[in-house]
């Protein structure tokens, strides 16, 4: 053991030891309790950032802690390798995304290994490998067979210059981020997964997720968006057709003054053929983004279609408007407008001089100026004929029943959740295993022809879909009739890859089936760690896919992740680290200067995992100083501990002196609190406990046999507490101080109940019920000793001067009251 702390050397030695001994490679073992710890897999950008390091350090602390607790721990790592960022990087560098991606993976794998994470690298997966996406294609075919994968027209953001679909974040001020062209709303044929078939189960099973943050549960509940409402039929004034409207407020039905339909509604398109003004309006609507948030905040605009519908109760004629705020994807693309009781309808009605008809008044009877603002709360019905003077809740049921009995409507449970559109008009993604044949139509690729390989030598230009230009890919033969046919050139949304990867880690070497029985052993994941930004999309899709895999008989649980931790961001100068802000701190430079253990210790100590972490250079220095202090202390006690650790009776040492028992009690109290905090994932306070223990031990001397044994016990506790957080130094010191074996093979320390027993009590001394002093006595002291100690207390003696004692009352373990 060197006198000075040399992190680069000891970290290299520890990592070589773990690799040579395959320390973190695990096998299924039914005799042991399993623990599956997983951090969200990264996109291989080429460089780890501090957000990565924090996420993975938290996960590693949890995994290593569970190893110490004797569990069979799986902690894997892989790469979310498909997607737009890689394609864009390839366009800029004029090279194939495959080359760029694999180079980055190699670099990032090395960086992760330098941090000493306890990953089972034998299970590494890369989502752009055909051995992975082959099974994703197989899964798509199973969904297609079950009717859960289907194709329909959908509205997208279309870049007319690059001839491609854009994500909302790729649009800047209404223009394509690369081409600068004005983005259009375009309807194209897209593949969807029928997540809506699982809406009710996805909502209900949120109640099972007892160890998820409430914020995430609420976000998912709102996203699924269950509501109880009524479907109402509005017949068109002319012809047999009708418009169906979904509403959660049938109590406002008598206040409808117009209907609004989406620009993409078939009726709007039909009217555009007969009106240039309507056609121009629809064209204008195409030049807006498709994101719901954007549509909600844009200026409300519309045009009269010239058509009328008939009110189902009053039989009044209602004008039908085409409005830019109505979403075709929501319900039926038709809204019943009640301007007096809906803010958006109110704004639109005032703009286009449409009538307001109040039908709800405040329940408390106070006046409301409906011209100034819509009254949106429940209340009492007015101007509603036979439903007048009824409260909104009662009216909901009465009007719903009336509509049903008269064939004009029906109750319906509605979900805000829409089917998952997985088509991407991009190159760098999983090919959708579908063939189009002029004779046979849409034909799924036979399973024995999987995988449909993505050509990896393409250099994308950013114009259109490269697969449409690659004849060797899209030209094929129909598997049914053997005539010339074409492949689907859309690729899958990368959220598909990340929706089932956690299960594939269980059996990445399996080439006969998607998942084998090992998946049932390891899933569900016991602890999942990732950012709150994935609360809805990724986590919801993974929950959906888990239920699909369960229904296919591949898994036997309902949910993918038992416990979820959403770690906070890493900030510097109060802002999230980013290259554009110039506030990035690179992990590599810190590891080189201080070592990986210092980086890990700072990240764990600086803040609780779920809170944001403010970067501090002085905090990093402080972590480094602590590890140097620990090293220096260990070097000083090395010879004494090596000698003690060779003794057979070292673990049965009895401390007799009160001061030694008190010191041992302090150490075990720190351990007790650390164990509580470890279970609560409050790792920063575990570090505080370790620092307290070291400060206690430093005051002791190895020249005293009792204190030397205290140092040995305390150091053994300290190193194991630190082992998940700073594994390299803990590994090295454990062996250098003669504790024997691998520290990871030793059980997690537990406080000795005897050590926690208090040896002395503090008792209150009263004279005639008034506090006059405090005394310390042994816990088992006799009544006589307690009385004698109390009567000899200095302040008590002063108050007893010239007084006659009538009696002394001793309340065991609490107080002494002297009556004078």
From Swiss-Prot:
GO process annotations (BP): leucyl-tRNA aminoacylation
UniProt keyword annotations, A-Z: Aminoacyl-tRNA synthetase, ATP-binding, Cytoplasm, Ligase, Nucleotide-binding, Protein biosynthesis
Reactions listed under catalytic activity: tRNA(Leu) + L-leucine + ATP = L-leucyl-tRNA(Leu) + AMP + diphosphate
Domain of life the protein comes from: Bacteria
EC number(s) given by UniProt: 6.1.1.4
GO cellular component: cytosol
Main location: cytoplasm
The keyword Cytoplasm is assigned to this record: yes
Statement: the UniProt record of this protein carries the keyword Ubl conjugation: no
SUPFAM superfamilies with a match to the protein in the record: Anticodon-binding domain of a subclass of class I aminoacyl-tRNA synthetases (SSF47323), Nucleotidylyl transferase (SSF52374), ValRS/IleRS/LeuRS editing domain (SSF50677)
PROSITE patterns in the cross-refs: AA_TRNA_LIGASE_I
Motif residue range(s): 'KMSKS' region: 576-580
Record motif 'HIGH' region, residues: 42-52
Subcellular location: Cytoplasm
Cysteine pairings via disulfide bonds: none
Protein residues bound to ATP: 579
Gene3D superfamilies: 3.10.20.590, HUPs (3.40.50.620), Isoleucyl-tRNA Synthetase, Domain 1 (1.10.730.10), Valyl/Leucyl/Isoleucyl-tRNA synthetase, editing domain (3.90.740.10)
GO molecular function: aminoacyl-tRNA deacylase activity; ATP binding; leucine-tRNA ligase activity
Pfam families: Anticodon_1, tRNA-synt_1, tRNA-synt_1_2, tRNA-synt_1g
PANTHER family, alphabetized: LEUCINE--TRNA LIGASE, MITOCHONDRIAL, LEUCYL-TRNA SYNTHETASE
Family: Belongs to the class-I aminoacyl-tRNA synthetase family.
Entry protein name: Leucine--tRNA ligase
Species for this entry: Coxiella burnetii (strain CbuG_Q212)
């Amino acid at each position: 053991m060197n006198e000075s702390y040399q992190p680069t050397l000891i970290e290299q030695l520890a990592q070589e030891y773990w690799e040579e001994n395959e320390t973190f490679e695990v096998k299924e073992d039914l005799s042991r309790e399993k623990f599956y710890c997983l951090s969200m897999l990264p996109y291989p950008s080429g460089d780890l950032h501090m957000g990565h390091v924090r996420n993975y350090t938290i996960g590693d602390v949890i995994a290593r802690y569970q190893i110490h607790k004797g569990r069979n721990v799986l902690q894997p790592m892989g790469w979310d390798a498909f997607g737009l960022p890689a394609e864009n990087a390839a366009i800029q560098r004029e090279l194939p995304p495959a080359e760029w991606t694999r180079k980055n993976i190699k670099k990032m794998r090395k960086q992760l290994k330098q941090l000493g994470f306890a990953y089972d690298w034998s299970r590494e997966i890369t989502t752009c490998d055909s051995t992975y996406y082959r099974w994703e294609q197989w899964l798509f075919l199973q969904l297609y067979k079950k009717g859960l994968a289907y194709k329909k027209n959908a509205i997208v953001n279309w870049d007319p210059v690059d001839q491609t679909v854009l994500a909302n974040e790729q649009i800047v001020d209404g223009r394509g981020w690369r081409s600068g062209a004005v983005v259009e709303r375009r309807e194209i044929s897209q593949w969807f997964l029928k997540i809506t078939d699982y809406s009710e189960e996805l909502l209900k099973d949120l109640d099972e997720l007892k160890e998820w943050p409430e914020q995430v549960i609420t976000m998912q509940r709102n996203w699924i968006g269950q509501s109880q409402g009524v479907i109402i039929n509005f017949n068109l004034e002319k012809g047999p057709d009708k418009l169906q409207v979904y509403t959660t407020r049938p109590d406002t039905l008598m206040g409808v003054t117009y209907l609004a339909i989406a620009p993409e509604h078939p009726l709007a398109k039909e009217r555009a053929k007969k009106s240039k003004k309507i056609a121009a309006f629809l064209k204008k609507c195409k030049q807006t983004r498709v994101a719901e948030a954007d549509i909600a905040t844009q200026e409300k605009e519309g045009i009269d279609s010239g058509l009328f519908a008939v009110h189902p109760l009053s039989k009044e004629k209602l004008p039908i408007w085409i409005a830019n705020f109505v979403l075709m994807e929501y319900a039926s693309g038709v809204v019943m407008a009640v301007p007096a009781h809906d803010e958006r309808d109110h704004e639109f009605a005032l703009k286009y001089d449409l009538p307001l008809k109040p039908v709800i008044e405040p329940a408390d009877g106070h006046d409301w100026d409906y011209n100034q603002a819509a009254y949106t709360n429940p209340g009492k019905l007015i101007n509603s004929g036979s439903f007048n003077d009824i409260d909104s809740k009662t009216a909901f049921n009465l009007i719903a029943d009336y509509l049903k009995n008269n064939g004009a409507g029906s109750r319906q449970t509605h979900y805000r959740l829409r089917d998952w559109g997985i088509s991407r008009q991009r190159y760098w993604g999983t090919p959708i295993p579908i063939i189009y044949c002029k004779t046979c139509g849409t034909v799924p690729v036979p399973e024995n022809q999987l995988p449909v390989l993505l050509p990896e030598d393409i250099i994308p230009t950013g114009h259109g879909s490269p697969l449409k230009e690659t004849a060797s890919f899209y030209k094929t033969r129909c598997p049914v009739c053997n005539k010339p046919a074409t492949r689907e050139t859309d690729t899958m949304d990368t959220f598909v890859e990340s929706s089932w990867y956690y299960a594939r880690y269980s059996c990445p070497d399996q080439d006969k089936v998607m998942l084998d029985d090992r998946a049932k052993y390891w899933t569900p994941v016991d602890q999942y760690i990732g950012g709150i930004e994935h609360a809805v999309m990724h986590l919801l899709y993974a929950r959906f896919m888990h239920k699909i895999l369960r229904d296919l008989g591949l898994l036997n649980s309902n949910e993918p992740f038992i416990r979820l931790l959403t770690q906070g961001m890493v900030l510097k100068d109060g802002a999230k680290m980013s290259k554009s802000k110039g506030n990035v701190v690179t992990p590599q430079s810190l590891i080189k200067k201080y070592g990986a253990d210092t980086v890990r210790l700072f990240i764990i100590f600086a803040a609780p995992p779920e809170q944001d972490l403010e970067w501090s250079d002085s905090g990093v220095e402080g972590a480094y100083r602590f590890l140097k202090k620990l090293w220096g202390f260990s070097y000083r006690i090395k010879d004494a501990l090596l000698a003690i650790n060779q003794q057979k009776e070292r673990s049965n040492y009895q401390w007799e002196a009160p001061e030694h028992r008190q010191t041992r009690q302090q150490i075990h109290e720190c351990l007790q609190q650390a164990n509580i905090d470890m279970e609560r994932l409050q790792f920063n306070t575990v570090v505080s406990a370790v620092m307290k223990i070291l400060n206690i031990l430093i005051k002791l001397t190895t020249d005293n046999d009792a204190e030397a044994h205290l140092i040995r016990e305390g150091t053994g506790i300290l190193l194991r507490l630190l082992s998940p957080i700073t594994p390299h130094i803990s590994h090295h010191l454990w062996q250098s101080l003669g504790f024997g074996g691998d520290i990871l093979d030793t059980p997690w320390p537990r406080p000795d109940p005897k050590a926690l027993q208090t040896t002395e009590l503090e008792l209150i001394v009263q004279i005639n019920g008034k506090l006059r002093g405090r005394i310390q006595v042994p816990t088992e002291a006799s009544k006589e000793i307690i009385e004698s100690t109390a009567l000899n207390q200095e302040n008590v003696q002063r108050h007893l001067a010239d007084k006659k004692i009538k009696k002394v009352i001793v309340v065991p373990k609490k107080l002494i009251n002297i009556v004078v």
